[in-house]
Amino acid sequence: MLSERHELNKIALLELKKDVEETREFSSYFSKMADLLLYVNEIYDTKERTLEQLKQWNRIWYEEISQEQYAHSFGNPEFCTEKFGKEYGQIFAFLYAEMRSGFIYAIEGRLFDLVINNELFLEISNLFLSGEEHPQKIKHIVFDHMRDYSEDVFEYRIREQLDPELDFATKIVMESDLSDPDILYQYGEYISENEIDTLKFLNKLPQEEITAMAKTYVDGFHEGFIINNIDMSPKRSVNIRYTIGFEPVVREAVRLFSEIGLAPIIYRSGVSVLTRGLHKIGYISSSPNPQYEYDHRYDQAIFFDNRFMKHKLECYHNAYEHYKDEAYVFAGPACMETFGEIAFLPENKEENLKLSKKQQELSVEFQMKASEIMNQYIKPEQRSFTIISYPIPEIGDNFEEIFKEVVKVNTLDKDKYRQIQQHLIDALNQAVEVHIKGKGKNKTDLYVAMHEMDDPSKETNFENCLADVNIPVGEVFTSPKLTGTNGVLHVGEVYLNDLKFIDLEITFKDGMISEYTCKNFKTEEENKAFIKENLLYNRDTLPMGEFAIGTNTTAYVMAKTYDILYQLPILIVEKMGPHFAVGDTCYSHCEETEVRNPDGKEIVAKYNECSKEGEYFQCHTDITIPYEELDSICAITLGGDEILLIKDGKFVLSGTETLNEPLTEIG
């Protein structure tokens, strides 16, 4: 049946090409789109594929949304609107982006997804061929299509995330000749020099270094279960997330995970409007054009309403119920992130689809309820994770040197940091609040309230964080008490979720965000909207979910030496100064799980006033103040005594002074 629909679609597309002039002023669009879909159908039909052919397809496919060609691409809402008017222009840009998912379906051999994609386009094109087109009619068609196929789409997506039997990418990793960089074109993702050069570089490293990198990563994941007293014996699978080009490390990680009884689940980040999120989750590659992706962040605005949200949640629940056995044995994600991309400063376009206020509220509600569904089947207290990060060649000419330095940072002596960080914790446990103050142009002036402890001889507010789930080593952190947490957090420049924020300033009142601004755009309205969309995720406020002090001065020296401070991921940057997370605490949904520090004390600061009432936000974004922008951090006791921890960016608390030794290298 599917194959018949596929053949009929190809015939209909050829007919559309013949009759395209009947779509009148829209003929250029429909002609281009028909060519695009005929191209992916031809790729699907080509069963014997050489690497050279895959390479050629890849370059042709991604070329037309490249930065060089995007100005005149139908994927550009600005261009489409200029050519066809706002109502049709936005719809056409949306449809173009949705049809581009067809390349992945063709490469993977996913005929069902390819067929329904074709049918959506053909149904819309028929409106124009018959002269019955109207923006509202098109939106109805899109809504009905998304609703009708949500069950199938979400069932497959959840299966992708839980079933090792879906092994498209696993086979590429485990069976390909990794000495040939062209094997990367098998994925169907955009392949740039970053991916090619990363693989070439890793192929030059001795096998023992590759094994050591994989072991650091796998051991971190395994230790997460041990440290948090989670029984790993029922677990049978792990999700490996990475950037294409790291296959030698991933292959070794698969082998090491198998030794502890875990099979790999490797899936790509979502490619359709139903499966894409604001963040890419899965295996990824460099973006052919970050502005294109930014322009299409809220494409769901064209059909997302309360009816659809409820239906989507029902489909989500049904999919998890179908794969509940696979969910039960899922151990969690092991994430290998990358950094070093050229900074992306997005352009705000009036023509982009945007969520209405009502849709924003529904989106927040969906994220909350979808998270609750997932947590029913993959219980937070029964899973773990790990996350590690490496540079990519785009970071500059010193890539190989920086890579080796990052490997060193990722494998620093945990025992040394355990002892030093304990001195910080002992001082912080005496505090009722901690005062953090910036210097120079940094306007930070914050008082963070601490939870009361019943028995300080057996309890602690701060976790001694070593290199297990969160690599590299180097922080102590707590869940602040919201009441009494007040002041301003300011950073001159910071990268959060691949976006650059300039002069980010957030005011907290009783632990909740009360005001915010930045200087990314000309108008205050644009700046506030940028923060609300990309930091608050369309909420009106978020709590301060974490306060931490990073101790990894070695990483800081590396950043300064190679001038990459503002290219490093938050995973490393958070270890290089005090940081504050907005959103949930680090113990979200796991507050009742007993966690102890190496000294045996139980960590008791796990709830805050929001989570105590069952209120969660499904986000956690860390914001760090670099040492150089820091005047002081001071623990203030109940009696008003001040215990100085850091002064002028240097550690001054007794027992922590050795952390300053790396800083002498940069003066």
Label for each model-derived stretch:
Residues 1-483, 647, 651-667:
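Active-site bordering "gate/hinge" segments
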Residues 429, 497-500, 540, 573:
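Short solvent-exposed loop/turn micro-motifs enriched in small/polar/acidic residues
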